[in-house]
Swiss-Prot record:
Pfam families: Gemini_coat. The lineage of its organism: Viruses, Monodnaviria, Shotokuvirae, Cressdnaviricota, Repensiviricetes. One of its GO terms (biological process) is viral penetration into host nucleus. Belongs to the geminiviridae capsid protein family. One of its GO terms (cellular component) is T=1 icosahedral viral capsid. It comes from the Viruses. Homomultimer. Interacts with the movement protein. Binds to single-stranded and double-stranded viral DNA. The keyword Amino-acid biosynthesis does not apply. One of its GO terms (molecular function) is DNA binding. This is Capsid protein. Its main location: virion.
Length: 254
């Protein structure tokens, strides 16, 4: 074919943002600005915010005392009511948990020279009873002073499930940290007689069905309780203080 281009067809080169315009379905910057400036559609199916319940150990700042063998506490304690920390329906779902605590040796342990592991568990109870179960009712705690060996007892494994576990290590050097030392002191240096423990757990997915009652104790739960279990190792006595935040929703019928 005669002519300057001999039948070849040439297309104009795309600009700097050509691919971006094509992905957005526009042809120019002007069309993009019009698209951005369009009023947004209202979102009518936005999910409600999570409710928050906070527990303090304790308000007098002394903390809770744990001895060898440990103790169990209900952590899904949601009484019936209209406040944010209350259940509004007969069923709740606990999604998240924030832990900001301190763990310290009891004063009776300062004279010892040793290390003490402290263990924590979040335990789901499918069929709770009238009171909190003891750790020995959940775990095979043959070695009471070595909680790291504990496991859910075989004949109750259909009822209890360990959701989360964590631990920390405390130390004692034989010196009372509350006592002032003089210039002639050349004893052992400081050690971890207390620690901060911070945790945040997601995707717990604990569904709790409640009885028709106003309180939030374990006896008010039909199905699905969540406990916090703490047990010190090495025969230690410890104190645990701080705050726990539970993030949950009220679902089901009122």
């Amino acid at each position: 074919m005669a002519g300057r281009y001999k039948g070849l067809v040439y297309s104009r080169k795309r600009g700097r943002y050509g691919k971006t315009y094509q992905a957005l379905g526009v042809k120019s910057q002007r069309e993009l600005e019009q698209l951005v400036n369009q009023p947004g559609r209202p979102v009518s199916n936005r999910r409600p915010a999570l409710q928050v319940a906070e527990y303090l150990w304790t308000t007098n700042k002394t903390g809770m005392t744990f001895s060898p063998g440990g103790s169990t506490f209900l952590i899904t304690n949601f009484p019936q009511g209209a406040n944010e920390n209350c259940r509004h329906t007969n069923r709740t779902i606990t999604y998240k948990m924030a832990v900001k605590t301190w763990v310290a040796l009891d004063g009776s342990m300062f004279s010892r020279v040793s290390k003490f592991p402290i263990y924590f568990w979040l335990v789901y109870d499918k069929n709770p009873g009238e009171s909190n179960p003891s750790p020995s009712a959940i775990f095979d705690s043959l070695y009471q002073d070595q909680p790291g060996t504990w496991t859910v007892t075989r004949n109750v494994c259909h009822r209890f499930v360990v959701k989360k576990t964590w631990s920390c290590m405390l130390e004692s050097n034989g010196v009372d940290p509350n006592a002032k030392q003089g210039s002639s002191y050349y004893g052992p240096g400081p050690c971890y007689q207390w620690r901060h423990v911070t945790k945040f757990f997601k995707r717990l997915g604990v569904s709790t069905e409640w009885k028709n009652s106003s309180t939030g104790d374990v006896a008010d739960i039909k199905e699905g309780a969540l406990y916090l279990v703490c047990a010190p190792g090495g025969g230690a006595t410890v104190r645990v203080g701080g705050r726990f935040r539970m993030y949950f929703k009220s679902v089901g019928n009122q």
